[in-house]
Amino acid sequence: MQNCIKLVPLALKCPQRAISTSAVLDGKRNFRKFNVHSKRGTRVVKEAQKTMANPPVPIDKRGVRDTGILVDGKFVEIPEKIPDIIVPDLTDCKLKPYVSYKAPEVVQSEFTSLDLFNAVYSKKIVEDFKAGSLQADGSPKEPSAEEKLTSSEAFLRARRTGSDIF
């Protein structure tokens, strides 16, 4: 028991070293954590910001641009630097400012090769049949530019920049 009493004063007198394991941004006095623009600093620094032409710590204007310049300590307004807000007339505009997120349910079948054929070629085939401009084997007497293409030419044309694929 007496040994413990003798060790306590020695332990209290020894300097202790400590290593901080917390991150720098989590410290108590870390001002980078909170954006407090134009609020920090002493009265002397704030007075220098107001009076000096080019203070060492400029006043943060938060993105607002000046509409003039300082000439001999006086602020001169420049009309060209004042922004004009041009609002267009939207009375006949078909677009509305709010679009509902509740879009109508659209059910569409899978687009097949038959659908593609009907969309592109069926109208011309029916017109050629009614006009009687088909040959005995079913090929047209006067083929269009798309019908004259070979399979390799059509393949290259479909892969070209500006086609419907891209």
Curated annotation (Swiss-Prot):
GO molecular-function terms, A-Z? structural constituent of ribosome
Return the similarity comment. Answer: Belongs to the mitochondrion-specific ribosomal protein mL41 family.
Enumerate the subcellular locations listed in this protein's record, separating them with semicolons: Mitochondrion
PANTHER family under this entry? LARGE RIBOSOMAL SUBUNIT PROTEIN ML41 (PTHR21338:SF0), MITOCHONDRIAL RIBOSOMAL PROTEIN L41 (PTHR21338)
Which residues are in coiled coils?
none
UniProt key word Ribosomal protein: yes
Q: What GO biological process terms does the UniProt entry carry, in alphabetical order?
A: translation
Write the record's keywords in alphabetical order, separated by commas: Mitochondrion, Ribonucleoprotein, Ribosomal protein, Transit peptide
Q: Which organism is it from?
A: Drosophila pseudoobscura pseudoobscura (Fruit fly)
Query: Gene Ontology terms, cellular component aspect?
Result: mitochondrial large ribosomal subunit; ribonucleoprotein complex
Query: Subunit details for this protein?
Result: Component of the mitochondrial ribosome large subunit (39S) which comprises a 16S rRNA and about 50 distinct proteins.
Concerning InterPro entries, the annotation shows: Ribosomal_mL41 (IPR019189)
Which gene name does the record give?
Answer: mRpL41
What is the taxonomic lineage of the source species?
Eukaryota, Metazoa, Ecdysozoa, Arthropoda, Hexapoda
| Name of the molecule in the record | Large ribosomal subunit protein mL41
Tell me the residues of the organelle transit peptide.
1-26
